Amino acid sequence: MLTFLRANFRWLACGFLLTLFSSFGQTFFIGLSGSEIRRTFHLSGGAFGGLYMLATLGSALTLPWLGRLLDIMPAWRVALFVLPALAASCLIFPFMPNVVGLAIGLYLLRLFGQGMMTETAYTVVGRWFSANRGRAISLIVPGHQTGEAVLPLAFVLISSWLGWQGAW
């Protein structure tokens, strides 16, 4: 196993980090700001849930079209597009001026985080590894769990200092 890790560290680290960074578009992370978002935009729980559902469905409907880029371009090039797109989404999301902007921000987070980041990770690793694909995937999937374990605590600590918008 160590030989496999050493020989393929670059690809495994890339996949792990992509799955880790997908956390910013996952429900567990966005939900950390749910109360503040509802308060800021004067939304009920149901209204926010409906908006979130629409953003998620929009992302799901867009994913096959955007994901097609992975079929026609090198995965590393797609990653070089998806990473800055997710970073920009994280930066603009908390400062959207109205509910329409909030919906767009949620859509972008869901599309580039939960959707494209994960799809790119699995595609990069799936293409690179043919004989050991299952082993490789099993080594990048913990990026999701690492995000679930570490990022909520980091977000809560940072938001206690900078507020929810500053933490994003």
Residue ranges and their predicted role:
Residues 20, 89, 100-116:
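Hydrophobic core of transmembrane alpha-helices in multi-pass small-molecule transporters
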Residues 28, 56-64, 148-149:
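Residue-level signature of mid-helix packing/kink "hotspots" within the transmembrane helices
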Residues 61-74:
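Helix-to-loop junctions at the C-terminal end of transmembrane segments
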Residues 76-79:
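Primarily marks hydrophobic transmembrane alpha-helices of the MFS/SLC 12-helix fold
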Residues 115-129:
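Intracellular juxtamembrane helix-capping segments at the cytosolic ends
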Residues 144-168:
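Helix-loop-helix hairpin linking two adjacent transmembrane segments in secondary transporters
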